[in-house]
């Protein structure tokens, strides 16, 4: 009996991008389409009270990521690039980079944060996102707006450099720069490869 054809994206996929680029939405959709586990790095990182393991207990955060990606197939959504590279990039097949324009990211962040705050959505079972503090640019790292505006070009340059690094030559990088490209990417994606029997 012939072996099933591998999926064109592989079995281990990472979705990255700036804040509000749609990483979790696309990652969850990919995982469902491919019938593999979905790993959201924010869910592994944030404890009640907006305590981030990446800052308070990096070893514990890294261990959580290792455990979540121990299997042979998964879709990971989120950045945390240092931790991602240390834990699973050596086994990564495909990285989908959501490189949307900064004005669009700001608008998406405003709409998302407002919706979450109005509905008091509980994120990752632990926290409710505030709205007004996200807009307080002068508060630096406490403001999501600050992160988007000040880190956009830096993150873009960093990702472009990673794409050229020999150590990551085994990874297929897919760069999506508009919402239409993301939609077309999803629509063109085949379903899960049939399992061997």
PLM ranges: what are they?
Residues 15:
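Hydrophobic anchor at the beta1->P-loop junction of P-loop NTPases
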Residues 37-95:
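Conserved nucleotide-sensing/catalytic segment adjacent to the nucleotide-binding pocket
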Residues 29:
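Active-site signature of alpha/beta-hydrolase-fold catalytic machinery across serine-
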Residues 26:
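Hydrophobic positions on the alpha1 helix immediately C-terminal to the Walker A/P-loop
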Residues 19:
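The conserved Walker
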Residues 23:
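Conserved lysine of the Walker
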Residues 100-155:
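A glycine- and Lys/Arg-enriched "phosphate-lid" helix/loop adjacent to the NTP-binding pocket
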Residues 2-10, 142, 146-197:
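NTP-dependent small-molecule kinase module
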């Amino acid at each position: 009996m012939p072996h099933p054809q591998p999926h064109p994206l592989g079995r281990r996929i990472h979705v990255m991008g700036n804040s509000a680029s749609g990483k979790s939405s696309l990652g969850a959709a990919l995982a469902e389409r491919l019938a593999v586990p979905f790993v959201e790095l924010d869910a592994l990182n944030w404890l009640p009270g907006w305590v981030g393991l990446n800052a308070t207990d990096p070893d514990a955060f890294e261990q959580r990521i290792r455990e979540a990606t121990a299997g042979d197939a998964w879709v990971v959504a989120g950045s945390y690039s240092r931790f991602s590279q240390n834990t699973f990039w050596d086994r990564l097949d495909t990285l989908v980079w959501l490189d949307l324009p900064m004005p669009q990211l700001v608008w998406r962040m405003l709409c998302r944060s407002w919706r979450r705050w109005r509905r008091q959505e509980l994120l990752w079972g632990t926290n409710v996102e505030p709205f007004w503090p996200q807009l307080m640019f002068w508060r630096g790292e406490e403001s999501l707006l600050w992160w988007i505006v000040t880190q956009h070009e830096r993150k873009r340059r960093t990702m472009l450099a990673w794409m050229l690094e020999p150590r990551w030559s085994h990874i297929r990088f897919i760069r999506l720069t508009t919402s239409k490209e993301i939609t077309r990417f999803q629509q063109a994606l085949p379903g899960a490869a049939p399992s061997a029997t």
